[in-house]
């Protein structure tokens, strides 16, 4: 006479304890599911953070290299003007760089110092270094002959100002040597 009370298919109704236990089991599994994504997020955050640091560091060094290139290009454009000013200065005022050059090379003339301070004269430096023991007249001839070849190799704006300086220094080299 008694018919089991069931929702469908004649199954017995579960006791409230059994249904609560099943919910608890599901709840215990749920925190594990929730924790797993958090752990994976923490790992990815750490990886992303490290990637950001590396990217910033590379970007920062790239800016520094660009700034150095800009500074060098500015120095290259300023150097001809500074060299012209150095020629006009008294020997006492602009002698710090010249003194260093004199100490490092024996028997060099003031023209050699001007050539050493100018950029893009590596061949001239080698020629002048190889003829340290020769007379001053030989050095003047070598540097005036070599400067015409060097100036043709340089860019037009740099070559024009340097050519003027080389011509001035080769014409008045005997006078400049007497001023020291």
Curated annotation (Swiss-Prot):
Coiled coil: none
Region: Disordered, residue numbers: 1-46, 64-180
Biased composition (Basic and acidic residues): 10-26
UniProt feature, compositional bias: Low complexity: 170-180
InterPro entries: SPAN-X_fam (IPR010007)
Residue stretches of biased makeup (Acidic residues): 82-169
Family, similarity comment: Belongs to the SPAN-X family.
Protein name: Sperm protein associated with the nucleus on the X chromosome N2
């Amino acid at each position: 006479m008694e018919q089991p009370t069931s929702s469908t298919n004649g199954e017995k109704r579960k006791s409230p304890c059994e249904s609560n236990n099943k919910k608890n089991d599901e709840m215990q599994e749920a925190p594990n599911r929730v924790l797993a994504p958090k752990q994976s997020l923490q790992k990815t955050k750490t990886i992303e953070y490290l990637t950001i640091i590396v990217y910033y560091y590379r970007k920062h060094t790239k800016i520094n290299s660009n700034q150095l290139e800009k500074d060098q290009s500015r120095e290259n454009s300023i150097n001809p003007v500074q060299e012209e000013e150095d020629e006009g200065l008294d020997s006492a005022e602009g002698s710090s760089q010249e003194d260093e050059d004199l100490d490092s090379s024996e028997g060099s003339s003031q023209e050699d110092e001007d050539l050493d301070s100018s950029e893009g004269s590596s061949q001239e430096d080698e020629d002048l270094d190889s003829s340290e023991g020769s007379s001053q007249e030989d050095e003047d001839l070598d540097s005036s002959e070599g400067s015409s070849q060097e100036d043709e190799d340089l860019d037009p704006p740099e070559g024009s100002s340097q050519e003027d300086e080389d011509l001035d220094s080769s014409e008045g080299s005997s006078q400049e040597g007497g001023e020291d």
